[in-house]
Amino acid sequence: MQIGVFRKKESGKAYKLIADTGVTIKRQAGFSMTYQWKGCLIEHHKRVLDVHNPFLHTYLHSFFEENYCQELVLDGKVVNILSPLLTHLSVNTHILKHMLAFGIGIRQLCDTASVYRHYYGEVDGAELEKIYHKMGIYRWIQVLNALLVGYLGMPADFLPFPLSGNEDAEWMIEDVLQVGNFGFYDKRFGSKSMNTGTRRQNAIGSLFHHFKMNVCYAPAEACWFPLMQACSHVSNFLKFR
């Protein structure tokens, strides 16, 4: 289960609340944390958008504050969830992050397809296109959308904006079928028996391979991703050694 606590003050309170229960908390790259709660693995994320380009953070922060959430009533209680626009951005940037690391599986593609179907007609497609262009990942999103339509059979009408018709998704679907869920089945970088748990054999080889594949479609993210991951590793080491 993944939980997002996105404002700095709130994320600090959430960490203290969990730590006070006595559960073992593991820090992850990307300023996230994981722990086991009643037999369920929980991931806490501090960022609503997995965007690693630091020059976009001011723009994204102001955008986030303006478009943060909408209210949903569950069992008579009002809870806040991400707005439809932010849900699109959050899911797709999260998938891109994993694609830049060790790859993704069919499950992650279904996440995007589900969002498109659920929020069909509720998002301004032109505004979403503008944001993707600003983030420098528009071409990558077009490949992702082409894959959903061309290989998974999702009706093109559910897309938030039209396909460009210029992007070939064959390279992406081939990688999805090769690596499996989060890259644990990629025999190019270690056998299945080697890639178990949360550790992968020859992780550097996999990272470099996915960098080369994606850099033409999301250049800034592909370049900043390994740098920011390394920074978060160092930060966690210095804070919690």
Task: Kindly label every feature range from the protein language model.
Residues 1:
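RNA/tRNA-interacting regions in translation and RNA-turnover enzymes
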Residues 5-241:
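Conserved NTP-donor binding/palm subdomain of two-metal-ion nucleotidyltransferases/polymerases, i.e.
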